[in-house]
């Protein structure tokens, strides 16, 4: 991470749980153990503030040190790797993305999605900070209960975040995106659970697309088997050595034990992490955040519905879960 605040939101709690399990094992008591401050000196998050919303900067003790207010609900927040700016992207159906100074919270500018589209909550800077990529969703026809096609908008930061190129996301309803190794990984969530589009639906149409990070060409795609078609692939995390995972949410609320964490292979193939059935059921079909620890050896999933954080070794061995009320 560069200077200033690193990207985390409430993922800090995931790392605290990961450290706890790594130190004490799956049966360790859920006690606060202290969390080392990130290399950048703090965290970034989005939150409800009074009657509105804000992007906020937190120090190593999670005290708020910068607040950028917004009338629109925000979701993912991403710091520039080369300066003090950060961008918080509106939650679907997002109308704005907020550019702000993460050192003092001062709003710098706002920008809108492309014509006929909405933001879906996430964007990423390129490594040199020159471009900002946003996942956007085309608005479906009026009255249609469907999720629109996905577009990755490539934006020129110095030019005021104007769109310079548009790529297909490789699917419908993209949510998260992330550069990992030599690919730009896009989680096309398809139909999002707990939305009007999801009513009576049994399959999301979700998948993973691996794009060329320079041209946007789709190199590979990954789909779930038919028995997991109700899952929406939503959030990504990488281990720093080219390994990437994706976490899911389930359309169905039938109590079945479906895996919600998958490893993404270089050809896009998806392999489920292992866990006992009761562990999957304990997440209640919903993972709101996924993150690796700084070493890349642990990966954790937070479920606000299950009120817990589940942790695995990155190799796939399930370690256990710790309670965390409404942790996401």
Language model: regions and residue ranges:
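N-terminal secretory signal peptides and thylakoid transit peptides that target proteins
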Residues: 1-20
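Surface loop/turn motifs at the tips and blade-to-blade linkers of beta-strand repeat domains
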Residues: 67-71, 112-115, 166-170, 223-228, ...
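Blade-loop segments of beta-propeller domains
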Residues: 68-79, 83-99, 105-125
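Repeated scaffold domains used in trafficking and secretory/extracellular systems
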Residues: 72-79, 118-124, 172-178, 230-235, ...
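Residue-level detector of Asp-centered blade-edge/turn motifs that repeat once per structural unit
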Residues: 81-82, 127-128, 179-181, 239-241, ...
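Asp-box/WD-like beta-propeller blade repeats and closely related beta-sheet repeat scaffolds
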Residues: 114-124, 134-178
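Short, conserved, GDST-rich strand-edge loop motifs in beta-rich repeat architectures
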Residues: 135-147, 186-204, 247-258
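Beta-propeller blade signature
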Residues: 149-157, 203-213, 259-267
């Amino acid at each position: 991470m560069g200077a200033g605040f690193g990207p985390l939101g409430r993922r800090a709690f995931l790392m605290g749980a990961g450290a706890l399990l790594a130190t004490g094992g799956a049966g360790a008591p859920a006690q606060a153990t202290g969390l080392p401050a990130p290399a950048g000196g703090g965290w970034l998050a989005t939150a409800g503030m009074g009657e509105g919303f804000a992007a906020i900067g937190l120090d190593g003790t999670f005290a708020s040190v910068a607040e950028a207010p917004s009338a629109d609900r925000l979701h993912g927040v991403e710091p520039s790797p080369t300066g003090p700016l950060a961008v918080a992207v509106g939650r679907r159906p997002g109308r704005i993305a907020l550019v702000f100074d993460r050192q003092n919270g001062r709003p710098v500018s706002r920008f809108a999605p492309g014509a006929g589209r909405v933001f879906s909550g996430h964007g990423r800077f390129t490594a040199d900070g020159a471009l900002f990529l946003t996942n956007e969703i085309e608005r479906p026809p009026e009255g249609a209960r469907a999720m629109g096609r996905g577009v990755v908008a490539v934006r020129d930061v110095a030019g005021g975040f104007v769109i310079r190129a548009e790529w297909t996301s490789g699917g419908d309803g993209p949510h998260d995106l992330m550069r990992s190794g030599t690919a730009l990984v896009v989680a096309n969530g398809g139909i999002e659970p707990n939305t009007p589009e999801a009513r009576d639906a049994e399959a999301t149409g979700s998948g993973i697309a691996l794009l060329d990070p320079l041209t946007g060409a789709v190199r590979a795609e990954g789909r779930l088997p038919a028995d997991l078609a109700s899952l929406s692939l939503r959030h990504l995390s990488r281990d720093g050595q080219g390994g990437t995972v994706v976490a899911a949410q389930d359309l169905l609320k039938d109590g079945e034990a479906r895996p919600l964490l998958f490893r993404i292979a270089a050809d896009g193939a998806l392999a489920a992490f292992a866990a006992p059935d009761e562990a999957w059921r304990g997440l209640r079909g919903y993972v709101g955040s996924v993150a690796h620890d700084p070493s890349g050896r642990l990966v954790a999933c937070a479920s606000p519905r299950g009120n817990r954080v589940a942790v695995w070794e990155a190799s796939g061995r399930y370690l256990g879960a710790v309670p965390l009320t409404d942790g996401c």
